[in-house]
Amino acid sequence: MKTFIMTAVALLAAGFITACVSVPKHHNMTGTWKYTFEETGKNEIQNGSMTIAQESYAITGKCNDAFGEFNLTGSMSENSPKFMIDGKRNDGKREFHLSGSLSCDKEFEGTYTTDQNTSGTMKGKRVIAD
């Protein structure tokens, strides 16, 4: 009986360890990024920078470009390198929504829309990983 209980405890412990090891690693955007964006229909590329903090799948941060400084909130997908970020300018006069995907740990590409009825593409590169 004692051997049976010890075996059951060992199997239970092995199950917990296996379950902990099998948790998928998700992508992380934490760091400082430089990005470029181009509005659809215009031949002008703008530059900006953003600092992102990610905890679990939640994204927060700030970005700064020719249109001002924006507070960022968003989320990373649990099962893929896709993310969504919403930005709201500090004075509340401009907002954007970015849907993107990490192409590797250091780069992303995506499309954005604004509350000013504009849209375009955005590309970024991580310059500092925190």
What is each of the regions a protein language model found here?
Residues 25-130:
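Central antiparallel beta-sheet cores of small beta-barrel/beta-sandwich binding domains
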Residues 22:
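Short, conserved catalytic or interaction motifs in soluble domains
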Residues 10-15:
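Core hydrophobic alpha-helical transmembrane segments of single-pass membrane proteins
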Residues 1-8:
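Bacterial N-terminal signal peptides that target proteins for export
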Residues 18-19:
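C-terminal motif of bacterial Sec signal peptides marking the signal peptidase cleavage site
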